[in-house]
Amino acid sequence: MSRLSIHPEGNTNATSPAEPLLESDDPAVIKAELAKRGIEFQHWPAKVKLHQNSIESDILAAYAVEIARVQADGRYPTVDAIRITPDHPDREALRQKFLAEHTHAEDEVRFFVEGRGLFCLHIGAEVLQVLCEQNDCINVPAGTRHWFDMGSKPQFCAVRFFDNPEGWIASFTGDAIAERFAKLP
């Protein structure tokens, strides 16, 4: 189940965090709270059961209709799919890279086809932790400071939309704030 936790940016540390300002697993509350901060959050049906050996082209073909709908306005001409499993050879290196606070010059749009991941958005004096699960689509606007945790045993597949043909390009902030917040097990 999707979940939102809003914390003060001055969280003490990951093992004894400050009390959250808000916690909810109500989809309407999650959508409304994120919308107040310029973040789009939607539920799309992940209607295709993918084979465990599905490759990127299979995933993109399975969701061709949804991809075409998003790309129709021309904002996101580039799309790919990422699938990380507990046996992925680069899972730990990828986790560490995504855990560092960063921004993008373009929106970060992710549709979770399978599994889950934790987006942490550093907006003003707050950190919003958004647990995204299958069927969730999140659009993090360009320039938003954030990090992503896939957990120590990741199991997710997401379709990623880009307005940049080069795909995922991050500008790391150098802020160690992510170390003060809980991560996925």
UniProtKB/Swiss-Prot annotation:
Necessary cofactors: Fe(2+); Ni(2+)
Keywords, sorted A to Z: Amino-acid biosynthesis, Dioxygenase, Iron, Metal-binding, Methionine biosynthesis, Nickel, Oxidoreductase
EC code: 1.13.11.54, 1.13.11.53
Cross-referenced CDD domains: cupin_ARD (cd02232)
InterPro entries: ARD, ARD_bac, RmlC-like_jellyroll, RmlC_Cupin_sf
Site positions (May play a role in transmitting local conformational changes): D107
Single biological process term from Gene Ontology: L-methionine salvage from methylthioadenosine
Binding site for Fe(2+): H102, H104, E108, H146
Annotated stretches, region: Disordered: 1-23
Top enzyme class: oxidoreductase
Reactions catalysed according to its record: 1,2-dihydroxy-5-(methylsulfanyl)pent-1-en-3-one + O2 = 3-(methylsulfanyl)propanoate + CO + formate + 2 H(+); 1,2-dihydroxy-5-(methylsulfanyl)pent-1-en-3-one + O2 = 4-methylsulfanyl-2-oxobutanoate + formate + 2 H(+)
SUBUNIT field: Monomer.
Protein family according to the UniProt entry: Belongs to the acireductone dioxygenase (ARD) family.
Name of the protein this chain belongs to: Acireductone dioxygenase
Organism listed in the record: Prochlorococcus marinus (strain MIT 9303)
